[in-house]
Curated annotation (Swiss-Prot):
PROSITE patterns documented for this protein: CYTB_CTER (PS51003)
Transmembrane segments: 36-56, 95-115, 131-151
Subunit structure: The 4 large subunits of the cytochrome b6-f complex are cytochrome b6, subunit IV (17 kDa polypeptide, petD), cytochrome f and the Rieske protein, while the 4 small subunits are petG, petL, petM and petN. The complex functions as a dimer.
Family annotation (CDD domains): cytochrome_b_C
PANTHER family referenced in this protein's UniProt entry, alphabetically: CYTOCHROME B (PTHR19271), CYTOCHROME B_B6 C-TERMINAL REGION PROFILE DOMAIN-CONTAINING PROTEIN (PTHR19271:SF41)
Taxonomic source organism: Zygnema circumcarinatum (Green alga)
Biological role stated in the UniProt entry: Component of the cytochrome b6-f complex, which mediates electron transfer between photosystem II (PSII) and photosystem I (PSI), cyclic electron flow around PSI, and state transitions.
Assigned GO CC terms: chloroplast thylakoid membrane; mitochondrion
Bilayer topology term: Multi-pass membrane protein
Protein name as catalogued: Cytochrome b6-f complex subunit 4
InterPro entries: Cyt_b/b6_C, Cyt_b/b6_C_sf, Cyt_b6/f_cplx_suIV, Cytochrome_b_C_euk/bac
Family indicated by similarity: Belongs to the cytochrome b family. PetD subfamily.
Keyword Plastid among UniProt keywords: yes
Gene3D superfamilies: plastocyanin oxidoreductase (1.10.287.980), Single helix bin (1.20.5.510)
Amino acid sequence: MGVTKKPDLTDPVLRAKLAKGMGHNYYGEPAWPNDLLYIFPVVIFGTIACNVGLAVMEPSMIGEPANPFATPLEILPEWYFFPVFQILRTVPNKLLGVLLMAAVPAGLLTVPFLENVNKFQNPFRRPVATTVFLIGTVVSIWLGIGAAMPIDQSLTLGLF
């Protein structure tokens, strides 16, 4: 637990700043609810106003109309579903593919229990969590790139 220095209210410079009302928060005033109930609506309404302004100034086209008689040869999902699509596409048994997809969050839930004795927040001092993150990132990128390729090149990414 850190040691915090309390403000010296007998300091004339500090008293002059406080008398001018510099800063919204005064010493001893809690941040919740005084500050946060003031700041949150301003940020939320500002974000909504910026989004509405951008949507009005730059309307994008919805796209070309769908033609039910001309289907594409291979239907691809959105880019963020590429790794999951690649798992389902390459695993021959669909039940095994669904179980592999369910194993990803189940495996991530076990990481804190594997490293529960380690109290450090530095990633270099938590080797299990860092290794799981790096391997998961590489595998997700590999599966995502492979999903956009034909099935015969998807596992090797066309390199071999």
